[in-house]
Amino acid sequence: MNVDLHMHTHCSDGVYEPEQLAQMAVDAGLAVISITDHDTIAAYDGSHHFPASLRIIPGIELSSDYGGEDIHVLGYYIDPHHEAIQSYSRQFRQRRLKRAMQMVDKCISLGYVVDKNQIEALLQKGGTVGRPHLAKMMVERGYYPDIKTVFDKLLYRGGPAYIPYHRYTVDQCIDLIHQAGGIALLAHPGMIKQKLDPILQFQFDGIEVYHPENRGHFDEYSRLAVQKHWLVSGGSDYHGVPRRYPEQVGVFCVDADNVRELLQYRD
């Protein structure tokens, strides 16, 4: 049985609507998924209808700052209706909109024609808006051939149209997830540039062992989980963005036996 516990939808920086992603997961033969959109629980607001045959673990991926680097914290089994997570999602959404508008202004100052109304319209669906949405607009207007090129040329961190954003501390992210009844796991450690040891001292409940950027380190992170008595998770980090691996749901997935304790956490 295959699962994917790290996926993104249009509610944050993915391409597809939650219903579309869920159906793609079913079509790919996945039995369990978790939609872990960045800093929002909009996929779980009750307006989306998912296939009955698919188990979905409520999740989120929170953005934190440690040592000037973006450290992501995955939350599983959160209560999407808990006031703490609802409040965070609302506040983050407003900050994200402000940031998106600032990036639009930068693009306009650079000579691009961008419609602010399109950005605001995206917010009507209850999710967040960010660089991928702006990049998609730039591609649609013919400025660049694909989303990756927009990031490489314009929206990369420190790029001509980039605007920094406020992030919680790692501790704050873990506390928020716990308040909402969930468990907090360190996301994709293979992507972290600084030394891991100080980060591993935070009160995580687990670690994302299986991730495309962790290749070559699966055994190392598995041993770490055993040493710390941590839960193990894994997923594709699927966004549906062209030229970003994996390009299809189910290409990178995890055997359920490798994440059995997490799957049975609430049984």
Regions found by a protein language model. Name each.
Residues 246-267:
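Short, basic/aromatic-enriched C-terminal tail that caps enzymatic domains
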Residues 84, 243-245:
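A short acidic, helix-capping loop that chelates divalent metal ions and anchors anionic groups
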Residues 1-70, 153-156, 160, 173-178, ...:
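An N-terminally biased module of ancient metal coordination in phosphate/nucleic-acid-related enzymes
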